[in-house]
C-alpha cells in the first residue's frame, strides 16, 4: 500500500509540476537533458542569450546567427514545449531530406529522447525519420527540396532551420501548412549569406534585437561589435601575437576576460534596434561565445584568413560575425549596368550578323536576343573574344511568339530553359530543328564544357561557370545594352549573388544564390544566349535562315 501511495504521490507531484510550466525556458530546464560537450540537465549558464529567445511571445521569430550559438537547440526546445504543453503539431524543415533530416533525427532528436525520461514518456513512436508521434500530436521533419513532403501536413508551429541553405521557392509552401491552425508560431533561423537574401531578408523586417549586458568594470550597458570591441594583435593568421587579441568594453576600455563571459553575460537582455516591426528578431556574433574555439585569439586568426581569399572572407562574416556579406565582384551593380548602356535602342527586327537568343521559362518567357561582334582571329573559347550587343530583351506568354522572334531577328541559334514547360519547349526546338537546344544545369560538367545529348536537343552545362561568364560581361564592359532597357531586366541581372565556399577537399568553390522574393529570369536568359554562341558557331552561321514550315 505504501508503494502504491508513493507512486500516486509522485504522479500527482509530477502533474502539478507539469501544469506549472508555462514558458519554453521552464520546460527546457525541467525536462531537457544534454549530452556532450555539456552533459547534464539543460542550463542557460553558457548561453544566457538563449533564455530571452526561448520565451519570446511573438508569433513570428527570426534568428540571424553566427555558427554554434545554440539557436538550433532553442528551436528544438520550443518545438518540444508546444508538442508537450499545448499538443500542437509541428513542422521542422531542414535544407534537404538526405542527409540533413536524417542526420538531425539521428544526432539531435533521438539523443534528446534517449537522455530525457520525460520525452521518452510522451513520444510513442520515433522510428520514422520524418514523422515522430507524441500521442495524438505530430512532429514532421522534412527537407525543403521536396514539395510533396511539405504538402498535406497542417501544423501550428513551423521551424525553418538554416533557411539560407534551403530551396527558397518552396518556403512559402511550408508556411502555408499553418493556414488551418488557430495557433501559428514560426521560427526561422540561419547563418546568413548575403544581404537581402534568405534569413537577412526576413531579419531586416524584424526588431533586430541585440544582446546588451552590464560591463563588469564600469557597470554600463554595452553590446559587442566587431571591430569596436576587439583589440587586434598580430599581423597575420600564423602570427603568435594574434593569441593576445582580446575583447574590451568600448566605454571604459577595460578588458573583458573570455573565461568570465558566462558570468557577466548572465543577466543580459535583448534590446530591439527597430520598433514597430512585424517580426521579433535576434542577432548575435561569436564574440559572445565562451567556447574555447571562439577565444578572441582564434577569432582574430579567422579575421586574418579572411584577408587571403573570398571563401574565408565569406566564412568570417557569416559564421563568425553572423552578418551577411557580399564579396567584391560577386554581383552585378547599378554602376556596371550604367557603364554598359550603349547608343542604340531596342530593335523590332534584325537581319545582319551572328544572332543568338536565350529564353528562361516560367509564368512568362523571358528572352534576350544578342548580336555578336567577333574579331577575325579568335582562340578556342569564342565567348572570351566576342563582344555582345543586346538588341532586344523582353518577355512573352507563348512559345508561338518565340517563333516570330526567331524569324524577325534571323536568330542563328537559341537555347531555352527545359523546365518547367518541357513539352512545349521540346516542340519549339523540334520546329526549329538544329537551331534550338534545351538547357539543363547539371553536375559532373566542369568549366564551360557543353555536353550535348545524342538527340542534340538538350545541352547540359555548369551553372556557376557560365553565369560567371555571362554576368561577368557587365564588369568587363564587353556587353552593350539598349538605352530603353527595362528596369525589370536590371533588377533580374542584379539578383544572383556569387557566394564562396570550400568543398570537402578544401578547394574554393562558388555558387549563385538569390533572395526568396527576388527574380532572376533575365539573368538566365542572358546566360542561355551566351551558351548559344558556341553552338551557333559549331553548326555554322551560313545555314538556311528561312522560318520553319
What would you call each of these model-derived segments?
Residues 477-548:
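Charge-patterned, long linear interaction tracts outside catalytic cores
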Residues 61, 103-104, 237-240, 244-255, ...:
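Mg2+-dependent endonuclease catalytic cores in nucleic-acid-processing enzymes, primarily RNase H-like
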Residues 1-355, 359, 407-419, 430-432:
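Phosphate/NTP-binding elements of NTP-utilizing enzymes
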Residues 70, 85-86, 373-379, 537-539:
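Compositionally biased, low-complexity linear motifs
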Residues 303-308, 394, 439-441, 541-549:
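C-terminal/domain-terminus segments
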Amino acid at each position: 500500500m505504501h508503494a502504491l501511495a508513493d507512486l500516486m504521490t509522485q504522479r500527482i507531484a509530477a502533474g502539478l509540476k507539469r501544469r506549472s510550466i508555462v514558458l519554453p525556458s521552464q520546460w527546457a530546464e525541467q525536462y531537457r537533458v544534454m549530452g556532450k560537450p555539456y552533459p547534464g540537465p539543460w542550463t542557460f549558464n553558457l548561453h544566457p542569450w538563449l533564455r530571452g529567445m526561448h520565451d519570446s511571445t511573438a508569433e513570428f521569430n527570426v534568428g540571424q546567427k553566427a555558427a554554434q550559438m545554440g539557436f538550433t537547440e532553442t528551436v528544438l526546445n520550443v518545438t518540444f514545449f508546444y508538442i508537450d504543453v499545448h499538443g500542437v503539431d509541428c513542422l521542422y524543415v531542414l535544407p534537404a531530406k538526405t542527409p540533413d533530416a536524417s542526420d538531425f533525427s539521428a544526432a539531435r532528436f533521438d539523443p534528446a529522447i534517449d537522455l530525457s525520461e520525460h520525452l521518452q514518456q510522451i513520444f510513442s513512436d520515433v522510428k520514422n525519420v520524418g514523422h515522430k508521434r507524441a500521442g495524438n500530436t505530430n512532429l514532421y521533419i522534412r527537407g525543403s527540396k521536396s514539395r510533396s513532403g511539405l504538402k498535406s501536413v497542417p501544423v501550428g508551429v513551423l521551424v525553418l532551420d538554416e533557411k539560407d541553405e534551403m530551396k527558397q521557392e518552396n518556403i512559402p509552401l511550408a508556411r502555408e501548412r499553418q493556414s488551418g491552425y488557430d495557433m501559428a508560431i514560426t521560427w526561422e533561423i540561419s547563418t546568413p549569406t548575403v544581404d537581402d537574401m534568405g534569413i537577412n531578408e526576413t531579419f531586416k523586417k524584424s526588431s533586430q534585437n541585440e544582446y546588451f549586458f552590464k560591463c563588469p568594470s564600469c557597470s554600463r550597458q554595452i553590446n559587442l561589435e566587431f571591430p569596436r570591441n576587439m583589440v587586434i594583435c598580430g599581423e597575420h593568421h600564423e602570427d603568435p601575437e594574434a593569441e593576445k587579441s582580446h575583447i574590451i568594453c568600448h566605454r571604459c576600455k577595460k578588458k573583458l576576460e573570455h573565461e568570465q563571459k558566462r558570468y557577466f553575460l548572465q543577466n543580459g537582455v535583448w534590446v530591439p534596434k527597430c520598433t514597430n516591426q512585424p517580426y521579433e528578431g535576434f542577432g548575435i556574433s561569436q564574440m559572445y561565445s565562451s567556447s574555447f574555439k571562439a577565444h578572441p585569439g582564434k577569432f582574430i586568426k579567422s579575421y586574418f584568413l579572411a584577408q587571403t581569399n573570398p571563401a574565408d572572407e565569406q566564412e568570417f562574416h557569416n559564421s563568425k560575425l553572423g552578418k551577411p556579406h557580399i564579396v567584391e565582384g560577386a554581383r552585378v551593380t547599378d554602376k556596371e549596368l550604367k557603364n554598359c548602356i550603349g547608343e542604340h535602342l531596342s530593335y523590332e527586327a534584325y537581319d545582319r550578323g551572328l544572332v543568338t537568343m536565350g529564353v528562361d521559362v516560367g509564368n512568362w518567357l523571358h528572352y534576350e536576343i544578342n548580336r555578336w561582334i567577333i574579331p577575325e582571329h579568335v582562340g578556342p573559347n569564342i565567348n572570351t573574344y566576342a563582344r555582345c550587343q543586346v538588341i532586344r530583351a523582353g518577355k512573352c506568354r507563348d512559345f508561338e511568339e518565340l517563333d516570330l522572334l526567331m524569324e524577325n531577328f534571323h536568330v542563328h541559334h537559341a537555347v531555352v530553359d527545359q523546365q518547367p514547360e518541357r513539352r512545349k519547349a521540346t516542340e519549339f526546338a523540334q520546329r526549329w530543328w538544329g537551331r534550338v537546344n534545351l538547357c539543363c544545369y547539371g553536375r559532373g560538367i566542369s568549366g564551360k564544357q557543353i555536353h550535348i545529348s545524342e538527340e542534340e536537343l538538350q545541352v547540359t552545362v555548369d551553372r556557376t561557370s557560365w553565369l560567371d561568364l555571362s554576368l561577368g560581361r557587365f564588369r568587363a564592359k564587353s556587353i552593350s545594352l539598349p538605352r530603353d532597357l527595362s528596369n525589370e531586366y536590371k533588377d533580374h541581372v542584379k539578383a544572383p549573388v556569387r557566394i564562396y565556399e570550400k568543398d570537402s577537399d578544401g578547394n574554393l568553390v562558388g555558387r549563385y544564390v538569390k533572395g526568396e522574393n527576388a527574380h532572376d529570369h533575365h539573368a538566365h536568359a542572358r546566360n542561355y544566349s551566351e551558351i548559344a554562341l558556341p553552338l551557333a558557331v559549331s553548326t555554322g552561321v551560313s545555314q538556311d535562315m528561312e522560318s520553319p514550315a
